[in-house]
A protein has these predicted regions:
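Structural motif
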Residues: 60-63, 93-96, 116-119, 157-159
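P-loop NTPase nucleotide-binding/switch module
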Residues: 136-155
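Charged, amphipathic alpha-helical linker segments immediately N-terminal to NTP-binding catalytic cores
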Residues: 91-94, 100-136
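Hydrophobic/aromatic ligand-binding patch that stacks against planar heteroaromatic rings
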Residues: 86, 110, 174
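Glycine-rich phosphate-binding P-loop
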Residues: 156-174
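Gly/Thr-rich phosphate-binding loop signature of adenosyl cofactor/nucleotide-binding cores
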Residues: 2-87
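Short secondary-structure boundary/capping elements
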Residues: 75-79, 99, 103, 143
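Fold-independent oxyanion-binding glycine-rich loops
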Residues: 65-67, 99-100, 122, 154-156, ...
Length: 174
């Protein structure tokens, strides 16, 4: 019986996070709620706003917290727009803003032009990221499905495994 099923990649739709985490939808492109999430890690894009993209993983959800927001707030609107456009051009699954922070007009415009889901939560960044990572780990955890029947023989548990339809249940009948 092959055990390579555990290496299978899992994914789920973005809408599941929106519902579970009770996120406010600021902007959702057409069919954006069906964007598939397949990475259990997240990214805080502070270094990317500063221009460093060498190890940037565009498969991850991006979480913008107070630190990133404060940095963007120090920039002139044209520079802020450029930095935001550059980040959102990478087409990651979604951008989530924490602490009910104000959405910069440049951020909303860029989300629309890049067809990027833009979501917001009132939770603090550390609480939200902890909940989100736990949720992602649960949804994307490796799993295996096996066909079997569990029986007791002289007080010991025995698990009979086999392909579907080969007679495991019939074997277990007394």
């Amino acid at each position: 019986m092959p055990f390579d099923e555990i290496n299978r990649e899992f994914s789920f739709p973005l809408q599941k996070i929106i519902d579970e985490q009770k996120l406010e939808v600021i902007y959702m492109p057409e069919d954006g709620e069906n964007t598939l999430i397949s990475d259990h890690e997240i990214n805080r894009p502070g270094l990317q706003f500063a221009g460093f993209y060498e190890y940037f993983d565009k498969q991850r959800i991006q979480v913008l917290g107070k630190t990133e927001w404060a940095y963007l707030n120090t920039l002139e609107p044209e520079v802020r727009r450029s930095r935001i456009d550059n980040l959102l051009s990478y087409k990651f699954p979604a951008l989530m803003v924490t602490r009910n922070l104000e959405i910069f007009p440049e951020l909303l415009e860029s989300a629309k032009s890049n067809e990027m889901p833009l979501l917001r939560t009132e939770e603090s960044t550390s609480v939200f990221t902890s909940k989100l990572v736990n949720f992602l780990n649960l949804q994307l955890a490796p799993r295996i499905t096996r066909h079997g029947v569990l029986i007791e023989i002289y007080g010991e548990g025995v698990l009979i495994l086999g392909e579907s339809g080969v007679g495991k249940s019939e074997t277990a009948i007394e």
